[in-house]
Amino acid sequence: MESLLKLEHVTICYNGEPVVHDVGLELNKGEILGVVGESGSGKSTIIKAIMGLLGNEGMVTEGDIWYKGKNVVDMQEKELRRLLGPEIAMVFQNSGSALCPIRTVGDQIYESMREHERISRKECAERAVRMMAKIGLKDGERVLQSYPFELSGGMNQRVGICISMLQNPALLLADEPTSALDVTIQKQVVEEMLLMRKEYGTAMIIVTHNIGVVEKMADKVLVLKNGKVREYGKTAQVLTAPEDPYTKELMSSVLRLKRTGTGNGGR
């Protein structure tokens, strides 16, 4: 079976300086990969490269990123844009910053949906309100009529998650999707993302500091330090019996936090 996503010996540079070195990973339909590591380790850079969002300063200088057998690195911008939404969607760490401040949430959701499917504004609103309810946004009608600056950071985060989920992408890339949410809402979001995988076979890459989220969701884990892969394997193996010294140190620090009742599952 051909993998949905495959990175082969990928090196990424910003302004000529390597920030990710020789990374490889593979993801099949319905699989979830957790990417963990300290801040600045290159976690977010990898998913930005998959989306073609490295900006003018960033570039994949070595290796290939294959999506359904096509090399994303070689794609023209127009071809890549066709993938974004119905094929590949992203939840940003700060979804509020990705929303337009002078347009209502409803307008922005409708625009993102109609780019990829024929849908009426009414149907779009109904689907959005249902999705919002599932991830803890109870007053969906009011949210649709609001501007992003009228909502809290946690509410904007859930709006971003809602937009991504509504498009039922084959691949969902999530950068700290639960970081701005309280524990109860985190649980709802995680459960809804797992339901997406069950119903639609959605594959996911979850970038997070929260080891509890990885433990709950991920089939595989990739551990990064200074842009290099330190460990990559099945979740149970990496979390409970890591081989790399850095991973052992990371997991032991998480265990200490759990025992003392501080932290947020490794965050």
Task: Provide a role label for each language-model segment.
Residues 36-38:
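The feature captures the beta-strand-to-loop junction immediately N-terminal to the Walker
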Residues 187-200:
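Helical segment within the ABC ATPase nucleotide-binding domain
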Residues 214-216:
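A short, surface-exposed alpha-helical micro-motif characterized by mixed small hydrophobic
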Residues 229-233:
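ABC ATPase "signature
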Residues 166-170:
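A short, proline-enriched helix->beta-strand linker immediately N-terminal to the Walker B motif
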Residues 59-71:
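Conserved ABC transporter NBD signature motif
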